[in-house]
Amino acid sequence: MAGSYPEGAPAILADKRQQFGSRFLSDPARVFHHNAWDNVEWSEEQAAAAERKVQENSIQRVCQEKQVDYEINAHKYWNDFYKIHENGFFKDRHWLFTEFPELAPSQNQNHLKDWFLENKSEVCECRNNEDGPGLIMEEQHKCSSKSLEHKTQTPPVEENVTQKISDLEICADEFPGSSATYRILEVGCGVGNTVFPILQTNNDPGLFVYCCDFSSTAIELVQTNSEYDPSRCFAFVHDLCDEEKSYPVPKGSLDIIILIFVLSAVVPDKMQKAINRLSRLLKPGGMVLLRDYGRYDMAQLRFKKGQCLSGNFYVRGDGTRVYFFTQEELDTLFTTAGLEKVQNLVDRRLQVNRGKQLTMYRVWIQCKYCKPLLSSTS
């Protein structure tokens, strides 16, 4: 979608897709010639059918007692997810450097372009399959849940990591990565499918990457990964909705905050405060990069009655939850937190299963929001 564009370029250039988004379906007869098509416009009938489907699967809501359980024990459901799948569920997100060149700003863009061309098929496949637990969760959960009972339980690192964070006195002079010149935080890092590609690709000696997840199992998998380098990365357990827990960095210290399919797992009523807190961590000119589910994505349409928690907010069969956004909702969240829009676009893709002759309509939203630079008077 968005590629690198000159500083000060018109905002419309930020929404112009330069590398991805170039395969258009002009002849419906060719739909099964490729695995995916970009910028697929929906007909009025298709949009109306999607709206009806959502109305149908939203009629019956999850009882309040279960909703409380899903909220209180959210970290346990995600721990179970990572105990089952470990680091085998998601693929490394190498496509991020095409979508978000801000993650490797000092890298030669021609070098990144050459790398992309050499690995185009692999990168495109990973991007086409990019998702949260989403569509195949139900099937995998059914066949994998029993295996969880037989796995060797490893001690959680949550208490250990949380204690280390609480022992840190967060100040402007001394904190993990305090000597770095470019700092990135990924919230909801999972097992490192974003963090490790960043560390591998961005060789800036001044780079330091923070990553957090409220699943202690996920953080343990990050810390025990052979690619984990404490001199360049700090992984910690954190619940972005817990206002009592502080981040291990001072306010105004981060250049980039990454939210990839994570905000959608938060209860809608808690989203604004979470974004407000993250916004305060950004330097002036710092940026939030987000990619998440859009309204009427196929994953939303596939939910059954009885899985809806509230409007456009659902629970999966394994207890993890997901919200489906509109562009306007995300814009309100970020601008209310004092950030300015750089990019807010809908990625409508038609994915194709050529073997089964199936078409699948995906809807994702990608955003970039920037913290305003300080004025000379301030």
From Swiss-Prot:
Transmembrane segments: none
Protein name per its UniProtKB record: tRNA N(3)-cytidine methyltransferase METTL2B
Provenance organism: Homo sapiens (Human)
Phosphoserine: residues carrying this PTM: S4
Gene name as annotated: METTL2B
EC number assigned by the record: 2.1.1.-
Physiological role: S-adenosyl-L-methionine-dependent methyltransferase that mediates N(3)-methylcytidine modification of residue 32 of the tRNA anticodon loop of tRNA(Thr)(UGU) and tRNA(Arg)(CCU).
GO annotation (BP), single: tRNA methylation
Superkingdom: Eukaryota
Chief location: cytoplasm
